[in-house]
């Protein structure tokens, strides 16, 4: 098990990457965006979905996750990462997992016009996906309601619940 890593989880558009960058800016932490790591090694996630499918993507997502550092890193997971059982187990067993929670309507406003591969399925299907994934996200140790909150406040909340209380890094 990866010790003392901090996991940011949430649906597409929840701001995982933005919050990750804000945390790095505030405390100069080691940070990794899982999707960015995948794109560096394998190319565009959109293209992977289009040419090889979601199952192939989830396999390389797991492979990339397993290659991550074992400790003291803030990691933004992909929106569907918790569908991979090994990744879900790591997050469930971590005291430092944070679900960035928002309403589907707010998230849809942020992603509706994006190039994300799953968005092409339409609002109704994505709403169903959100409901399914929400059960996975809710297994995080900490749930942060991000509705109408600034990125800096969200990042500071995560920092206060890790560095100060648990003295992780």
Question: What is each PLM-predicted segment?
Answer:
Residues 78-82, 103-105, 149:
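Short glycine-rich anion-binding loops that position phosphate/pyrophosphate groups of nucleotides
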Residues 15:
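Conserved glycine(s) of the Walker
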Residues 36-89:
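ATP-dependent small-molecule kinase phosphotransfer cores
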Residues 94-135:
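A glycine- and Lys/Arg-enriched "phosphate-lid" helix/loop adjacent to the NTP-binding pocket
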Residues 8:
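Hydrophobic anchor at the beta1->P-loop junction of P-loop NTPases
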Residues 11:
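P-loop (Walker A) phosphate-binding loop of NTP-binding proteins
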């Amino acid at each position: 098990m990866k010790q003392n890593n901090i996991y940011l989880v949430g649906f597409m558009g929840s701001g995982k990457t933005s919050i990750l960058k804000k945390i790095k800016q505030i405390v100069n932490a080691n940070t990794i965006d899982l999707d960015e790591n995948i794109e560096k090694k394998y190319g565009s996630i959109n293209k992977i979905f289009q040419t090889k499918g979601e199952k192939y993507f989830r396999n390389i997502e797991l492979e990339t996750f397993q290659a991550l550092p074992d400790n003291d890193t803030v990691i933004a997971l992909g929106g569907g990462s918790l569908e991979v059982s090994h990744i879900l187990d790591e997050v469930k067993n971590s005291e430092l997992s944070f679900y960035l929670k928002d309403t589907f309507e707010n998230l849809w406003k942020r992603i509706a016009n994006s190039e994300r591969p799953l968005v092409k399925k339409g609002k109704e299907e994505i709403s169903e996906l959100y409901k399914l994934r929400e059960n996975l996200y809710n297994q995080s140790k900490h749930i942060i309601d991000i509705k109408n909150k600034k990125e800096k406040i969200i990042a500071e909340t995560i920092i206060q619940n890790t560095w100060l209380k648990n003295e992780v890094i």
